[in-house]
Amino acid sequence: MIIGFDAKRIVRNASGLGNYSRTLVGDLQRIVPEGTQLRLYSPDMGRDELRGQVKESSNLRFVYPHDCYTKLSRDLWRMKGIVEDLKKDGVHLYHGLTGELPLGIRKAGIKTVVTIHDLIFMCHPEYYNWIDTKIYAWKFHKTCREADRIIAISECTKRDIMRFGGVDPSKIDVIYQSCSTEFKTRESEKKLQQVHTKYMLPERYIVNVGTIEERKNVLLAVRALHMLPEEVSIVIVGRPTPYADKAKEYVEANNLQHR
């Protein structure tokens, strides 16, 4: 059996969708039955340090488009041209790892699975520009029609898919995201103390990791501090946006700097 994957995020995204894609493919590489081949279809080679996290082997290799020398041609290949390569390579099943499927794949007779991570652009369109929400919505509805099975990463996402896409719940499977093996590593007490000192961490704290932007609502976590014991603090890790200033203003206005 040959399974194809949309590998754009594998080679381009260092966090989020990229981590999900790399971890899933890496895990499958170890457990698929003998004779199963994994093909990772990417419009370009992306970043070496990300691509290198997925090791090519006898049952896994990357596939790139031929004669696509411009960004537009590579984008068009991923949107539609890839289907011809999937047919030529004899792919039996294609997994859209990040909520998209190429045009015409159902007509080509290739079975499909798609993972949908969230529908924030439909639940909260105010966080996106107008044209992006229209493009994302079109892709979402098209994907729901084309996919044989849909993977939702949470029960909440499943409800949103049913609500906005009118999808039969029997077509949706909830499969939670995996966790990278790097988080299983136990650091030495010396290393832990070094990090504790470097970042002046309190004894008890909650960690919030992710871009500090409005749709991730870290301000709500800050506001909840008064409901927790005084000795519990919050440590926020991530790339700041102007929204981070709102959280800082709330902290200062409510004398929470020590937490």
Question: What are the residue ranges of the model-derived segments?
Answer:
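Carbohydrate transferase catalytic cores enriched for Leloir-type hexosyltransferases
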Residues: 1-259
